[in-house]
Amino acid sequence: MIRVHRIRLDPTATQGVYFARACGVSRFAYNWALAEWKRQYEAGGKPDEAALRKQLNAIKAAEFPWMAEVTKCAPQTAIKNVGLAFEHFFRRVKLGQKPGYPRFKRKGIRDSFRADNGPADATSHAVEVTGKVVKLPRCGVVRMREALRFAGRVKSATVSRMADGWYVALAVETEDRLTAKQDRGAVGVDLGVTTLATFSDGTTEPALKPHRAGHKRIVRLSQSLARKKKGSANRAKAKAKLARLHLRIANVRKDALHKLTTTLATNYSTIGIEDLNVSGMLRNGSLARSIADAGFSEFRRQLEYKAVMTGAQVIVIDRFYPSSKTCSGCGTIHEITLRDRVLSCGCGLKMNRDLNAAINIRRQALALQSVERKALAGASASVKPVSVKQKKRDVHRNVQTA
């Protein structure tokens, strides 16, 4: 299992200059590879990132000698990222989604570079972590604000510049010590903008709305930035101040989501959530800011990877299932609007619509889980017995590559 720990760095002035230079090399290599990919494709060729890496290696000593000032990993991993960007682009095209053609990178926007370690049996590694220091290629030992949390082999280090300084994201290959599956009960979770999460057992998690809380300050700093002369030192200071505020808002949101998803993944074995169409919901002009402030997509991402580590199962309910409109008592479907906060049914049930939806999500998740288990049981029962000789042949064929 690959786990990533992002840690703030305390580089010296010289190391900070090196980081900026390495980010520039990475950005240049990415833009060069993207332009070359487009040129070859328009000429009728079939470009690929491996060929582009070889092409750059052949010409960089003569045409780009300044690349030798930083680790060779910076341009190489940048070109790999171009290949990944096109993989995602073609995947979205096949799925009929908005493709999002890869774009050129600008200076000062998400500056980063990556250094990869070699194979596990290599005698030396480009990236090494000891206590609160990390050794990076061509840079030396850099101090970290905290020690690495995970034990295992460090596969790579991605150094990036945030609004408040430099960070390193360490990817660590750890042992697959997953928590044994236990029956900790099931829960349905309904997400919303007024109340972030409502559990089927009645527990609620209020929405922090960090962006709304800091909106006035964002407006004030944005107006101050607009009044500054372009290229001036005061404009750079105002821009950095605004960026730090945006980073703080994002961190407050992410921290709240981490606490919520950790609670769910550790306290329940079956978690039902809805397959929300977040991109479609963001088209609602009156609710777009509140929906973006809640972080629904980040909630699902965190919950799914944490559930794997705790042995829980996340069951995603179809987005068209009328969880809010269906009475959790008798199953009658009602026509209600977003203004209706209470569901009243002829059967006598009168309940908060979010709690009613969470109960329905839990019930639907358990039903889907039961169907899945029956299907797996039927599939295992239909498997024909295999001879000992056949098993020996299969052992040699099934080589794990993941």
Residues of each region from the PLM?
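Nucleic-acid substrate recognition interfaces
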Residues: 1-402
